[in-house]
Amino acid sequence: MLTDRQLLILQVIIDDFIRSGQPVGSRALSKKHEISLSSATIRNEMADLEELGYIEKTHASSGRVPSEKGYRYYVDHLLSPQRLTQEDIQKIKSIFAERIYDLEKVVQKSAQILSDLTNYTSIALGPAVKDNKLKRIQIIPLNKQTAVAIIVTDTGHVKNHVITVPASVDPSDLEKMVNILNERLIGVPLIDLKDKIYKEVADVLRMHIHNYDSMLKTIADTLDIPQEEKMFFAGKTNMLNQPEFSDIQKVRSLMKMIEQEKDFYRLLRKHNRKGIQVTIGRENQLSGMENCSLITATYSIGKEQLGTIAILGPTRMEYSRVITILNRVASDLSTVLTKWYQNN
């Protein structure tokens, strides 16, 4: 159990190191107005904090820097929310200024604004398409041989696919087919569509449409949408501006980790609990992230959790600011998406 004096010194050390990136010494601490202690007393307390594993000495300086344990304690017990500026709030609102009605585009724009506001790397994991349900199918003829099939889900995901229309299929039959598909498939999870077409809808099509079989496979393939979530990055190179990554080996390790999108995808999938989650350094259990922290939040439509947004930064991250911004974006994103899609 840390004493009040140790808590104060630990908080000031971490705040100062986050701000400056420079190791913090007892002399510098003694000049802080929050700390009315002598350099000798501060040195003794710092020695205890070091022995307890909350701070550590660097080779190049007599000052101390926070350890992973120190950052963890700081995030769990010492942080207070940071007030957002009006400029911050306006930038967040700009995500939703256009009524895009395309969930992927809104999520992608959220990632960009998060990166702009924090100067770190942001990642957004889109909704798992397999969890979406079909809202509407349209087939619009382009000419006698081709048409565009438009698939719209209940969460605004839109897929356009150019298809070949066999010469044996009459335009009026195409319209009938679309009506039957919408009657039978609206509200069906995308993961079940292909199976349902062959097992249930095919018999209805056979009764009403000549040469239905020539279009059946084309439509079924069109509805076979990839089911993994899409992952969007913004500000991939922002981390290179951090002094921690001036070392070329650390840069290589970091960039390799970011480029390994499958590993990063699996990492984000683990961060699917509601609320803000912070993992620091080696807690991330991913090579290349030893000097990084990851802060994540989930977003939803109503009570249905859809995806994850995250900020990747150095362990010397502005935790208070980033958590406040991420929490606001996740909350606003959930509110707006619920308003747009839940009742449609």
UniProtKB/Swiss-Prot annotation:
PANTHER family: HEAT-INDUCIBLE TRANSCRIPTION REPRESSOR HRCA. Gene3D superfamilies: 3.30.450.40, Heat-inducible transcription repressor hrca homolog, domain 3, Winged helix-like DNA-binding domain superfamily/Winged helix DNA-binding domain. It comes from the Bacteria. The gene is hrcA. GO terms for molecular function: DNA binding. Keywords: Repressor, Stress response, Transcription, Transcription regulation. One of its GO terms (biological process) is negative regulation of DNA-templated transcription. The lineage of its organism: Bacteria, Bacillati, Bacillota, Bacilli, Bacillales. InterPro entries: GAF-like_dom_sf (IPR029016), HrcA (IPR002571), HrcA_C (IPR021153), WH-like_DNA-bd_sf (IPR036388), WH_DNA-bd_sf (IPR036390), WHTH_transcript_rep_HrcA_IDD (IPR023120). It holds the Pfam family HrcA. Negative regulator of class I heat shock genes (grpE-dnaK-dnaJ and groELS operons). Prevents heat-shock induction of these operons. This is Heat-inducible transcription repressor HrcA. Belongs to the HrcA family.
